UniProtKB/Swiss-Prot annotation:
Keyword Zinc: no
Protein family according to the UniProt entry: Belongs to the bacterial ribosomal protein bL9 family.
Keywords linked to the UniProt accession: Ribonucleoprotein, Ribosomal protein, RNA-binding, rRNA-binding
Species this protein is from: Saccharopolyspora erythraea (strain ATCC 11635 / DSM 40517 / JCM 4748 / NBRC 13426 / NCIMB 8594 / NRRL 2338)
Protein known as: Large ribosomal subunit protein bL9
GO molecular function, one term: structural constituent of ribosome
Gene that this polypeptide is encoded by: rplI
C-alpha cells in the first residue's frame, strides 16, 4: 500500500515522503496513529503544495537571519555597565536578557534571549564575545564591553 507520511517515522522516512508498506502495517499502526495517510492523487498534490510553502518559508527565514547577522556585525561593541565591588568583581552576572536589552538600545535588532549563548556566566569587567544563534545555519558573534557603573 502506498502511503504519505505525516510525521517522521524511524526506519521508514520523513514527513511528506511517499513510501510503499505492507497493508497490515499501514492499517494497524501508521494510519490509526495519524503517522500516515493513504496516497491518493489529491493527497499527493496537497503534500507538494505544503512542501513548496515550507521551502519558501525556510528560504525567507534564512534570508532574514542573514540580514540580522549583517545588522549585528555593523554594531561593533555593545557597552553594558554594571555595579562592581571594590575589588573589581561584578555583583551578580550579566545575563542573556541584559545583552539583548543592550543590543536593542544600541540600535540593533530585537533578539530572543534564548538565542544568546554567553558561554557560561559573565562575571568580570572587560570585553567578552557572545554568540547569537539566528538560524540553525546562521550564527553571529557580538562583542560586549562590560564597564563599571559610577
Amino acid at each position: 500500500m502506498k502511503i504519505i507520511l505525516t510525521a517522521d517515522v524511524t526506519g521508514l522516512g520523513e514527513s511528506g515522503d511517499i513510501v510503499e508498506v505492507k497493508d497490515g502495517y499501514a492499517r494497524n499502526l501508521l494510519l490509526p496513529r495519524g503517522l500516515a495517510i493513504v496516497a491518493t492523487k489529491g493527497a499527493q498534490k496537497q503534500v507538494e503544495t505544503i512542501r513548496r510553502t515550507q521551502e519558501a518559508k525556510r528560504v525567507r527565514n534564512l534570508e532574514h537571519a542573514q540580514e540580522l547577522k549583517q545588522q549585528l556585525q555593523g554594531l561593533g561593541a555593545v557597552t553594558l555597565t554594571a555595579k562592581v565591588s571594590k575589588q573589581g568583581k561584578l555583583f551578580g552576572s550579566i545575563t542573556a536578557a541584559d545583552i539583548v536589552s543592550a543590543v536593542r538600545k544600541a540600535g540593533g535588532p530585537n533578539l530572543d534571549k534564548r538565542s544568546v549563548d554567553t558561554r557560561g556566566h559573565i562575571k568580570s569587567l572587560g570585553k567578552h564575545a557572545v554568540d547569537v544563534r539566528l538560524h540553525p545555519d546562521v550564527k553571529a558573534s557580538v562583542s560586549v564591553q562590560i564597564s563599571a557603573a559610577s
